[in-house]
């Protein structure tokens, strides 16, 4: 009888810890994204360039990924796409 009670208590504590962890992970993963095109190529430090471009925006973005856009016409300057995110 005592073993069953202890097993039940340990199971309840374990379930509580698992549920709490899942809620923490879901809260940490919520990020707001913004994609925007800028003139120029990404180069070696494209992610830093994107962070600099987004510095003057209303929100502070902390993660960026730079991708060179396909050039449609040779007469147009090269473009890059910045995909940046911040905690919501």
UniProtKB/Swiss-Prot annotation:
GO biological process, one term: defense response to fungus
First and last residue of the signal peptide: 1-27
InterPro entries associated with the record: SCRL
Disulphides: 32-88, 42-66, 50-82, 64-84
Pfam families in the record: SCRL
Keyword Magnesium applies: no
Keyword Disulfide bond appears in the UniProt entry: yes
One Gene Ontology CC term in the entry: extracellular region
Record keywords, A-Z: Antimicrobial, Disulfide bond, Fungicide, Plant defense, Secreted, Signal
Location(s) in or outside the cell: Secreted
Main location: secreted
Family recorded in the similarity comment: Belongs to the DEFL family.
Name of the molecule in the record: Putative defensin-like protein 228
Lineage, top ranks: Eukaryota, Viridiplantae, Streptophyta, Embryophyta, Tracheophyta
């Amino acid at each position: 009888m005592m073993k069953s009670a202890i097993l039940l208590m340990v199971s309840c504590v374990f379930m509580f810890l698992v549920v709490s962890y899942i809620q923490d992970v879901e809260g940490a993963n919520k990020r707001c994204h913004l994609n925007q095109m800028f003139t120029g190529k990404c180069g070696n430090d494209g992610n830093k360039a994107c962070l600099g471009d987004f510095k003057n925006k209303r929100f502070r973005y902390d993660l960026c990924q730079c991708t060179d856009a396909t050039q449609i016409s040779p007469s147009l300057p090269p473009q890059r796409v910045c995909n940046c995110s911040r905690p919501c």
